[in-house]
Amino acid sequence: MFNLSNLLASLVGIAMAISIHEFGHAYSAHLLGDDTAKYNGRMTLNPAKHIDPLGLIILFICHFGWAKPVPVNPNNFKNYKVGNLIVSISGVIGNLIGAIICALILKYFDMYAIQKIFGQAMWINIGFGAFNLLPIPPLDGWGVISSLLPYKFNDFIYKYENVGYAVLLISIFTGIYS
């Protein structure tokens, strides 16, 4: 059954989770020497800079969506693999921090609207973070795994990376994550 308060709380939670996640990537890349995201106006918590309109529409239809990827040039890092690892995991860490902040707000504020919005935001942050840990391209878990593998696997990784997109789409549309 349609519930407007749930929809609005979800929209706020999704905007918050996407913004925190993408800002985490942009800020960590900046700290590691890559200002690509900063020059593209993406080092911000403003959801309008991160939300992909089509990804948001698909999210409400299929319960799966996407944000605009933060542009990162790992060639600007002192160590390509370490930098890529840190930037990949930073979005997930951002979602974890977001969930903790929401939990603290829930603990200290006992108003219905705050409980509704920040309760949704907490669970959405946890869900985004957990989902992004899957080791499937283009998710962050894949960035972590590929950064930990020796350089000799790079050709294999890049050759078969597109297979990961297909696996991700098939698994989502078959309902394996439901």
Feature map (PLM): residue ranges:
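Hydrophobic transmembrane alpha-helices and their immediate loop junctions
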Residues: 1-178
